[in-house]
Amino acid sequence: MKKEIKFSLVYRDMWQSSGKYQPRADQLARIAPVIVEMGCFARVETNGGAFEQVNLLYGENPNKAVRTFTKPLHEAGIQTHMLDRGLNGLRMYPVPADVRKLMYKVKYKQGVDITRIFCGLNDVRNIIPSIKYAKEGGMIPQATLCITFSPCHTVEYYTNIADQLIEAGAPEICLKDMAGIGRPAFLGKLVKAIKEKHPEIIIQYHGHTGPGLSMASILEVCENGADIIDVAIEPMSWGKVHPDVISVQAMLKDAGFQVPEINMNAYMKARSLTQEFIDDFLGYFMDPTNKHMSSLLLGCGLPGGMMGSMMADLKGVHSGINLILKGQGKEPMLLDDLVVMLFEEVEYVWPRLGYPPLVTPFSQYVKNVALMNVMQRVKGEDRWTMIDNNTWDMILGKSGKLPGALAPEIIELAKSKGLQFTDEDPQSNYPDALDTYRKEMDENGWEYGEDDEELFELAMHDRQYRDYKSGVAKERFLKDLQRAKDAEMAKGGLSAEEILQIKRAKADAILAPNNGQVLFELSVEGPSSSPSVGSKYNQDDFFCYISTPWGGFEKVHVGFTGRIVEISAKQGQMVRKGQPIAYLERE
């Protein structure tokens, strides 16, 4: 019998790789005991990049969500881990050092055991400080190698980085094959090289199924010494996401490895619950093409999770490109032709930008440059004329050291713009900032929260946190959700009137008790306005006034708990007795 292989359920990344949002705290509270019941997971990825921020985006408190999810897993002896972008923390751009230090203290107190620290450029300067900060905060630092396939990403390149990270105190190494393009034999050689030199180091493999290599890669890394494999569950496994635990377990068991058994009754429960979450609201923001695999990903190297955003970008510019072509007297381009053109442009751009591993945020930078180049070429203009500031920061070395050399044309372009290259430690560009955020919280009368977790959220995601606190985030999300639901119904061939009838059929009308003018609020500071679709009202809440013809103001109360799905009478509109003012769906 070969060595024991453990499984980690990447529940957070399953959602990130499939769509825009993450489950709510109440949903995580329901799935966690079922994950425990499955009995096959030593670890679960609970939070990190694209989790806390996403909670804020739909108006929920991420700290509550993290604590809710980790507690039952901890009680069952399952280790929890989070995704950590090193210098970028939990966001897409650099974070001051004092905020990075606070992150580990907060997340440890919230029940997160392990932090998977990665830098999209594999620059150890962005990872090593986090190893130290994580240990000081009580967490286990899992240092990460971002896997890609290029002439400069050799076994020697990666083992040299691993040596430095292990020397800095990392007890674990993750091979983050975020696009699934790591070649199986190569990955096996890399694991073997690390294990031969550092047999005590735990190696965890994280791969995506997009190009179709993942199962072979898993077998290779296990045969060469890997300890833990990241897996998913239905209905979100496969496609461009992750391999399913059932298939991985069966393959490794047949190969002679010791693997845990799966409680299939619990698996089916987890599958059903996850589908319920998709049907509830998450599915409205999931791109169906993420369920498709594509060998084309091997050529461009883009992560599977990016395909949805890339297709959205392409659909957005497709009609514009065809208008340009029409003006030039040329035939219109099919969307599939445009996809191939973009893939080919990524292959052209990537080496000339120094082969940055195509992982967040650098995958977005490369994709955006390629997309802009395609647009410029269609117009008959030069490449490289539409490079944004974030991409220039990467090119100039402000995010870290690029693995490969920049093309001479890029260097010349930078010089022509008067831009300066740097090899300074990227952190030196971002001074400490917690005192500034403490002052803001004090001025607003906001609590720092348990273990300073609210202070941390403001410091990490300041704009999103302010929108969350003001209620703007919730309001915006509910509008987006209603639009997405309406669009889905419209796809089914329903007219706007039919969609309205369906929404009304599920809702209760708030009726005018008398003839008069609708006044939702009486503002003395600015214009009064109607409430937003999605706004919640409780049973005894005041809803509006009716200004009657005889000069009275009659209060209208809701009478039940629900959310607005339609405003039928706008602020200031005249209504007759019994006329619907609004429709609310009961909760």
Where are these regions (language model features)?
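Active-site beta->alpha loop and helix N-cap motifs at the rims of alpha/beta catalytic domains
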Residues: 33, 48-163, 180-183
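Hydrophobic faces of well-ordered beta-strands that scaffold small-molecule active sites
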Residues: 5-13, 19, 42-46, 78-85, ...
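Short histidine-centered loop motifs in beta-beta connectors
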Residues: 519-536, 560, 564-573
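Terminal or standalone catalytic/regulatory effector modules within metabolic enzymes
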Residues: 15, 36-54, 292-297, 301-507
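Catalytic cores of alpha/beta
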Residues: 156-165, 211-227
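C-terminal helical cap(s) of enzyme catalytic domains, especially alpha/beta-barrels
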Residues: 237-262
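Short hydrophobic beta/alpha edge segments that flank linear recognition/processing sites
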Residues: 532-556, 576-587
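Glycine-rich phosphate-binding active-site loops on the catalytic face of alpha/beta enzymes
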Residues: 117, 177, 224-243
